Amino acid sequence: MTNSLAEGTRRKSRIKRLRKLRTSIAEKGLDALLLSQPENLLYLSGFTGSSGWLLTSEQNAILATDFRYVEQAKGESSDFEIIQTKRELHNWLPGLASDLGWHKLGFEANFISYDSSRKLSEAIKTKQVNLELVPTTGIVEQLRSIKEPEELGFITKAVELVDAAFEQAKAIIRPGITEKEAAWEIEKILRQEGSEGIPFEIIVASGPNSALPHARPTEKTICSGEPVLIDMGARISGYCSDFSRTLFLGKADKTFQEIYNIVLKAQTTAIEGIESGMDTSQADRLARSIIEQAGYGDVFGHGLGHGVGLAVHEFPMLGPSSSDLLADGMVFTIEPGIYLAGQGGVRIEDMVVLENGKARVLTKARKNSFQLPTFSNQQKSQREDRMFNREVTK
């Protein structure tokens, strides 16, 4: 597909998204909606700057930004009226709303700070503008949760990139390398494979550190006879992937083998049982019940998964107290885990897309082989040299 054709397709998609958003705005009885979350601006307008405000009503589609991004916005968001503003909302929004005849303005309650909303409310009173601020959540996120074919294509490429990178990463995980060194090597692999940066800090957690679900790589040296949890992702054309595997250096002990098999069974059960129309807490229950029955329910302390798209964590959220409904077109992770404090943990994470009512697994990296050889990086180099010398002397 040529660049001009691809851009034309994306422009049509954004116009369609804007139409759906306007329907949602009308259904909520709002005159307009103010958006500031970067992923939502990108989704609706194509704007990639780090500072901007999108205002949408039945008649208006406005992208407001400061001097730094005006020219960029004109190039990326040609279907929107671009206005240059000061960065503080309260300095310009009340006057604009008054000029456009808006009286009920929705805003992203989970993204605008308390201080910003307070200053905006005070400015509305001071300027005697007839404007009611209405907190909203999830309006655009609901639209983003159903992936269009082009979006799914980008996500699939990001997943394939991580699959390929993991095969290379397994050669890095050896006794003697630190968690930080391994994480850096994995990041380099991801970038070399074509990832547009990384969507989150790579996790390499070994031994007891693998019992920390969101561990950060440390100076700890990876040793033989311990688990190593790897969590990484890639980004292609703005769309993310998310992936976890747990490896073991050498022959796994009985406890690790047990919890690994339980986690794998929990994940497989969830993948096979999840259906469109299912409540997300029911989806979580599919895996959680397996772990609870095995006696480890109290150490599976996070939800089963989360949506992935322009953000690495987005709607839907699959957890024991969530109540969203799954639908065809949603892309999300399935990542049960067991974490034994002071010993180690296991998490296995795949990405799936709901199609024809069932989950199709996007992630292809193997899960049934988790034990790695224990020779060190120095031994690995010596072994490769010996193999090379044997080939030369033949």
Regions found by a protein language model. Give the residues of each.
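Active-site neighborhoods and metal-handling regions in enzymes and metal-associated proteins
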Residues: 1-390, 394
